[in-house]
């Protein structure tokens, strides 16, 4: 069987083989590809398991003997000048052949649909001749372009990741009205104010809707993503499929004795939806209970702390975060780490006393999954699909989305109660072993 993956990024193993730069985003894709490449007969590739159900809604899985004959192709956006990339690579310990295809996409403006992508996908489909197309995510317009030209909904599967419509609806994350309406020079020049960012998510949601209406199958893992996808297209066949994380997170174990006292780790904080401002608002209460508390944030910095040039580029949300840091006297208590590799992320998880996911909405965040695999005590918003993967008081602590007092209480409990932290850690590892 020939399966074509359509991805949002060039996966690191492919980029390394082609001597290209690569993104560390969407690490779980590397996880599932790695599992396929390092399995001798390829029988563990979950995307292939729904092929029979494409002809027979109801989800019957096909046998391993068919999956073993799988041939994989992967399409992904590439840098300008490499749009015609079409190359067979030998990857992994078993030197499995993977057909790799590039396509052009304006990743700076994912809200814009470019019909020129359709011609490229037609070339890719004609060359690879897939039996099944598996589109990972609904966030980018290339998914709809591919599904449109393939035009075989019974053989098209979309893996639900984040859902643009829920991101758009929750984007403001309780920001004050004046902050929502504010703009910096950077925002004006890039036409990228907070309001415009939300509108772009609504535009992306339109392409997401078109995609889900043009396919027959989706994979998901939460009540949240199932409800939203079936509201958009009630005729979809929904397949439950948990994710595989990056291999680095399947080894190692959090130990409270090896953590930095008071260290709080979050994986992202560069736009409102991720809720970094909630944590900053909660810090005064947290510091009353744990004076050594401090925050480390992975990902891009929007705080404008790297000289005049970075100050000029600061967005309105970054200015708001800076004001919260000053107002709550958190200078020296917040450190933004930049983009981290999997190994670097793992080190930060293991050195932290707690991982916090304060987002306004998430489906099932990979950052929570990685923390659970390592046994890092987790505190997360009760929102979206998170309650499906975090059982409150067992595999983490939940607080109401946007309730900074509950957030502070959860963080304080874990930072000050070593026995609770150890119990959560053990339960999280048990949960993660079943889910991921």
List where the protein language model places each region.
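Short alpha-helical donor nucleotide-sugar binding micro-motif in glycosyltransferases
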Residues: 125, 347-352
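Aromatic "clamp/platform" in nucleotide-sugar-dependent glycosyltransferases that forms part
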Residues: 360
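A charged, aromatic-enriched C-terminal amphipathic alpha-helix characteristic of glycosyltransferases
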Residues: 419-436
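Conserved acidic donor-binding segment of nucleotide-sugar-dependent glycosyltransferases
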Residues: 392-393, 397-404, 413-419
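N-terminal subdomain of nucleotide-sugar transferases
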Residues: 1-87, 92-99
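Nucleotide-activated donor-binding/catalytic signature segment of Leloir-type glycosyltransferases, i.e.
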Residues: 309-339, 343
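Short hydrophobic beta-strand element within catalytic cores of glycosyltransferases
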Residues: 377-380
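Conserved donor-binding/catalytic core segment of Leloir-type glycosyltransferases
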Residues: 4, 255-274, 280-287, 295-298
